[in-house]
């Protein structure tokens, strides 16, 4: 069993690396700008060129993934599943951890499962509450039991206790508790582990009606299906029409990032709501209960347990979720910042991979290098690129002032041209976002279409 790393400080040096790289880059950019600006200019040109190439590379993959997405939407996957012998052996265990959500949100998630094209008698649905939210949980539990009585093969409710040693209160620890409880039911029903898929969803997840059928089809046709997690396309579209413009831009950005990753499964981790084999979840001892980003860690747990023989298979169908919201514009921005900070919490995974990879000599070194580089490069550019390009990029020219250096004199024009090329990504994202928009709700005015267009000026 891999060591749990949620209790920070055990591997302090490796925990410091993301911060050292980020702040070291900023200090280096400021220092060279003040004392040797021509060096800073060269660095900025190289970095901007790298960013432009990355944008173009990103657009190629997003375009390819979008075509696959559109083609997948055209297929009736339940009809395809029925062509496979013994397809009814596949069960879905849907895990919905909750904390403080309204009855409406949970009801919509269950309703989406009930209205999927996959047979309801092949669903085991688990709604997990927290002891700290017990009163709210018990109130909606009675209503949900009444509304969905007899709908699924089994609907169960669990209550995750507070204060379990080694845990932090969060989605991961609740998922671990829920898995343990449904494990007892699965054993009692004598359902073979290899016939079960687990859908670990955020509670606001509205799965596409064909998602579970498509997933079952993949599970029945993929090579070594028990050695793969399954990643859908995440659309933060449930409330996209009422979210603030910065939140909408960020939400679409996350969707396009994941869309580009789907066509490169060799570098993928799982993200947010996704699915996995029950056998894998049991083999690794469920989700780790003491960290923030359990959604991606569970993939690495499987990768380590199976000595690198574990992957992510893309599912080119969407699951719809809520974009972050607040009562005011600034509250929404604060919630967005906290969400992005949680996703970018690279200090959890880097020390974990470095320490665990050393314990697994059977994993090919090329795979270890790939995951380490992709993770570190992704976290690094995420934190540094916006500030380097749009803020510190101007500093060396301001310090240099009027100069006879041809490099410094001509660099702004070169950088301007590169940024103009990079804006292709913005225009492409803006155009593509309209294909992912849900129908305009009745309470939203028509002029909001104009805001949907103008927001990309941000």
PLM segments and residue spans:
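Internal catalytic domains of large membrane-associated glycosyltransferases
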Residues: 70-348
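Structured alpha-helical bundle/scaffold domains in large eukaryotic membrane-trafficking regulators
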Residues: 64-75, 190, 352-359, 395
């Amino acid at each position: 069993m891999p060591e749990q790393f949620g209790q920070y400080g055990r591997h302090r040096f490796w925990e410091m690396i993301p911060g050292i790289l980020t702040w070291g880059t900023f200090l280096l950019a400021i220092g060279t700008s003040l004392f040797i600006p021509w060096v800073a200019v060269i660095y900025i040109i190289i970095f901007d060129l790298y960013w432009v190439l990355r944008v173009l590379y990103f657009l190629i993959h997003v375009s390819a993934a979008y075509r696959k997405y559109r083609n997948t939407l055209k297929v009736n996957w339940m009809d395809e599943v029925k062509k496979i012998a013994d397809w009814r052996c596949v069960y879905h265990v849907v895990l919905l951890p909750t904390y403080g959500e309204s009855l409406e949100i949970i009801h919509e998630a269950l309703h989406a499962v009930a209205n999927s094209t996959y047979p309801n008698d092949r669903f085991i649905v688990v709604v997990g509450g927290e002891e700290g939210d017990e009163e709210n949980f018990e109130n909606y539990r009675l209503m949900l039991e009444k509304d969905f009585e007899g709908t699924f093969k089994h609907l169960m409710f669990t209550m995750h206790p507070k204060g379990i040693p080694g845990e932090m209160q969060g989605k991961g620890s609740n998922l671990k508790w829920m898995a343990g409880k449904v494990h007892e039911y699965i054993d009692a029903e004598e359902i073979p582990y290899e016939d079960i898929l687990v859908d670990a969803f955020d509670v606001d997840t509205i799965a596409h009606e064909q998602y579970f059928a498509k997933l079952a089809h993949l599970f029945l046709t993929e090579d070594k299906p028990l050695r793969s997690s399954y990643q859908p396309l995440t659309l933060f579209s449930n409330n996209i029409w009422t979210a603030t413009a910065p939140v909408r831009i960020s939400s679409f950005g996350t969707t396009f990032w994941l869309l580009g990753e789907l066509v490169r499964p060799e570098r993928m981790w799982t993200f947010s709501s996704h699915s996995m084999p029950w056998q894998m979840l049991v083999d690794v001892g469920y989700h780790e209960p003491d960290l923030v980003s359990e959604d991606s860690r569970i993939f690495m747990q499987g990768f380590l347990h199976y000595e690198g023989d574990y992957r992510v298979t893309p599912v080119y169908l969407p699951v719809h979720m809520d974009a972050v919201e607040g009562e005011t514009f600034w509250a929404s921005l604060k919630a967005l910042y906290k969400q992005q900070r949680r996703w970018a919490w690279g200090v959890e995974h880097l020390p974990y991979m470095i320490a665990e990879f050393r314990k697994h000599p059977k994993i090919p070194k090329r795979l270890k290098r790939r995951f380490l580089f992709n993770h570190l490069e992704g976290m690094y550019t995420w934190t540094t690129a916006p500030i380097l390009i749009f803020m510190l990029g101007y500093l060396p020219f301001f310090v240099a002032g009027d100069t006879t250096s041809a490099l410094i004199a001509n660099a702004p024009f070169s950088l301007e041209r590169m940024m103009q090329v990079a804006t292709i990504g913005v225009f492409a994202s803006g155009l593509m976002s309209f294909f992912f928009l849900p129908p305009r709700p009745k309470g939203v005015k028509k002029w909001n279409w104009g805001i949907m267009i103008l927001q990309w000026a941000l």
